[in-house]
Amino acid sequence: MLKILIPVDGSSHALQAVHHALRLVGAGLKARFVVANVQEAANLYELVVAHDPTVLQQVSEAAGRDLVRPAVALLSAAGLQVEQVVASGDPTNMLAEILESHGCDAVIMSTHGSGLRAAVLGSVSQEMVQQSAVPVTLVKVPKDEQPA
């Protein structure tokens, strides 16, 4: 049985990848899933102002859990095995670590359309395609949902 990583960022675009995975399962794919969110690491200002790095870590983890919840709920409702992971750091590097540590065989993730915003946000998906040791399926966001 394949183990597939689905990175999510809380956007409706990320849920497109979950819906694609559900379509594949509906067509007969046997898989279990790891839904992951990578939070940005705290910057120096946040560390100084917070006075307690543990609090920042707890807030970051809670935010990540909130962001993976819809994807986990969709997959669980379909009766699929789902793990959830929240990490902090550089998204591409952390996703590569999650791939390896969880023994994932593939990645399904969304792209963010086109334009300047996509050039920044879509860079994680492009980096994953270039750097991943496993197949990466990119789910394109429909034109009517792409950012301007």
PLM segments and residue spans:
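Structural beta-alpha unit
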Residues: 73-107, 145-148
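Glycine-rich, Arg-bearing micro-motifs that act as flexible, cationic patches
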Residues: 106-131, 145-148
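Intrinsically disordered or low-complexity boundary/linker segments at protein termini
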Residues: 1-19, 131-148
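Acidic, proline/glycine-rich short linear motifs
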Residues: 37-66, 146-148
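Small/aliphatic-rich secondary-structure junction motif
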Residues: 2-51
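General small-molecule cofactor/ligand-binding pocket signal
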Residues: 34-36, 83-87, 137-139
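Short secondary-structure boundary segments
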Residues: 37, 110-112, 141
